[in-house]
């Protein structure tokens, strides 16, 4: 995975958690962020990327 994309995902998850969002809302926020910076990615691919980052 592109290290820059991984950093974007980690930051989105951190920001969502700091805002008091639950696990699902954190994930949704990260997927939205990925789709904003990588509009070529489908929602499914963005979700897969978020899940991969969470597992690391």
Q: Which residues make up each language-model segment?
A:
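C-terminal alpha-helical interaction appendages
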Residues: 1-56
């Amino acid at each position: 995975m592109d290290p820059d994309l991984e950093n974007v995902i980690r930051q989105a998850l951190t920001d969502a958690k700091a805002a008091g969002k639950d696990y699902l809302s954190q994930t949704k926020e990260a997927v939205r962020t990925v789709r904003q910076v990588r509009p070529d990615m489908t929602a499914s691919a963005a979700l897969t990327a978020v899940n991969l980052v969470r597992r690391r």
